[in-house]
Design a protein with these regions (language model features):
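Cys-nucleophile CN-hydrolase/nitrilase-fold catalytic domain and related Cys-dependent amidase chemistry
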Residues: 5-86, 92, 154-174
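Acidic/histidine-rich helix-loop elements
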Residues: 1-3
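Detector for methionine-enriched segments
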Residues: 5, 11-13, 114, 125, ...
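Active-site flanking residues adjacent to catalytic metal/cofactor-binding acidic residues
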Residues: 28, 128, 179
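Active-site catalytic loop in hydrolytic enzyme cores
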Residues: 71-142, 150-163, 167, 172
């Protein structure tokens, strides 16, 4: 996790130093926790990760959408949390559609979560949520202008990743901004990458 934290901080600072007028930086699903065994993911580590993301938003002076895990009393949630530069949490979404073995170890979320930046209403989705058109439709019906998607999508479903990005955007008339993990993830699993913006 420490190495992941160093990489995240370096990337966030690079964006902050080289890009002007950035309103939101997105990081992929469970960005810091790759390689963590879930039974070992305790409240102390969960809180440490939460505090880290808060500090990153403050350091870069912009909003950060962080894919993270959170340990609560009833179990572990797969979250996408938006941290403001002043330390506030603007949005906190728990993944609704858990994928395969996630169902054995994680608790599903139950609610749509939207937040607003500069008059733009943004809905949050995580990875497998993207495969369900009803969820993005519900966001659109509730006035969402943009979907922010944090993911850890893997091969061989790379074509499906592209299709979901294009479909969710065009079928709802919304922008879709998605970020995906890239490269080998262990046990022969390779993540697609291919982060994109569709309109």
């Amino acid at each position: 996790i420490k190495k992941n934290m160093e990489n995240v901080e370096k990337m966030a600072m690079t964006v902050a130093e080289n890009e002007k007028n950035v309103d939101l930086i997105l990081f992929h699903e469970a960005c810091l926790e790759s390689g963590v065994q879930l039974p070992e993911f305790d409240k102390k580590l969960s809180d440490e990760i939460h505090d880290f993301w808060k500090s990153i938003a403050k350091k870069v002076g912009t909003n950060v959408l962080a894919g993270r895990l959170e340990r609560k009393e009833d179990g572990i949630y797969n979250k996408a949390t938006v941290y403001a530069p002043d330390g506030r949490i603007l949005a906190d979404y728990a993944k609704i559609h858990l994928f395969n073995s996630e169902r054995e170890t994680l608790i599903p979320g139950k609610e749509l979560v939207m937040f607003e930046l500069n008059g733009i209403k943004i809905g949050i989705m995580i990875c497998a949520d993207f495969g369900f058109p009803e969820l993005s439709r519900a966001y659109a019906v509730n006035g969402c202008h943009m979907l922010a998607v944090t993911s850890s999508w893997a091969y061989p479903d790379d074509d499906l990743w592209t299709i979901c990005n294009q479909a969710r955007s065009s079928e709802n008339g919304v922008y879709c901004v998605s970020v995906d993990r890239i490269g080998p993830a262990g046990n022969g699993c390779v993540k697609v990458g291919r982060s994109m913006v569709c309109n």
